[in-house]
Amino acid sequence: FVEVSEAMSLDCPPGSAEPWLPLIDASSDRESFDKRFPEKKPDDVINFLIRDRLNPNSIISCIQLARENARQIRDVLTTEMWEQINILYWNMQEGEAIWNKPRQEQLSEIRRACQLFYGITDATLSKDLAWRFSILGRLVERADKTSRILDVKYYLLLPSLDELGGVLDELQWIALLRSAGAYQMFRKAEQNSIKPESVARFLLLDPIFPRSIRYCLDGISNTLKMID
């Protein structure tokens, strides 16, 4: 989400929070944010989403909760999984080197660490009931994230109706695809120019892209059948 708004901010006046506020809307945290940050500065939005421990949906809060959940089921996890979630948790504490890096590098490092955890889980955890529940949770999370990414675009208002289908509109759709890790696979599936209906169809209905809502729902259904 943050990376989408990072790209969109280039087309807005310096200091404008307009490209960032859709992130707050999409995460349903607008009321809480407005009460605490009435001036709505871009840095306030970014810190609220990434490092704010009072925001239960911030990245750092989610990782803290994930580590606590992992601690409670420590006997189910492999040592490698526990080590990885701890590395991510401790690397995100105040004063750590990650916070001295540019914002894009911070986000990339966090994303890679999360992807590494998924890879370690698939490589080290026996494919038993615990693994199936982890897959179920992952698919639910992905479907929710993709729907929220589409919400971000809904809230990203264009300067005027004349911009619909224009350069700025296309840039927003490209940024949205990249935020879902879907740009390259979309271009392989759709040879024509980027159109809103094509992007929405791909992210909602593509049967083989692992982050499309259809793929996730099919996976959820199949996993529930295996659990049953």
Regions found by a protein language model. Give the residues of each.
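Alpha-helical transmembrane segments and their helix-helix packing motifs
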Residues: 1-228
